[in-house]
Amino acid sequence: MPVGGRRITAAGAFIMGRNMFSPGRGTWDLDWNGWWGDEPPYHAPVFVLTHHPREQVTMKGGTTFIFVTDGIEAAMAQAREVAGERDVAIAGGAETVNQYLAAGLIDELRLHVAPVILGKGERLLHNVGDITLEPLGAPSGTRLVSHLTYRVIR
């Protein structure tokens, strides 16, 4: 899906939090390999932040989930190394995005907003420090989703 002239999944590597990969906390259910079925949409390495080690999981289509237990900076360093000249995308969830915003490691924020109220959950832009979001281009989307892109100014 093009956003700002680029595909969401065109990054050379992705980073996500544990909850974006798997439900539950604690030790892993090794039968669980993500929400996406046999062929996730990433088609690149995905670094999953976690406190619980797990062997990497290789899926169809070029997606490999690599589990990182030593923090956001370590995950970013590994992702940058494999991405080369391509972008590294933070795939979420909100707490992971907030950690990277607070650390000053996000340059551009792409939000895909669906008109669904889910109830309680993590708040985006919570405890991220003093940042300004500059809109890049006009919002796009459909009645089911709005795509918004911002430059992060520190």
Predicted feature residues:
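Enzymes that bind and transform nitrogen-containing heteroaromatic metabolites
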Residues: 1-154
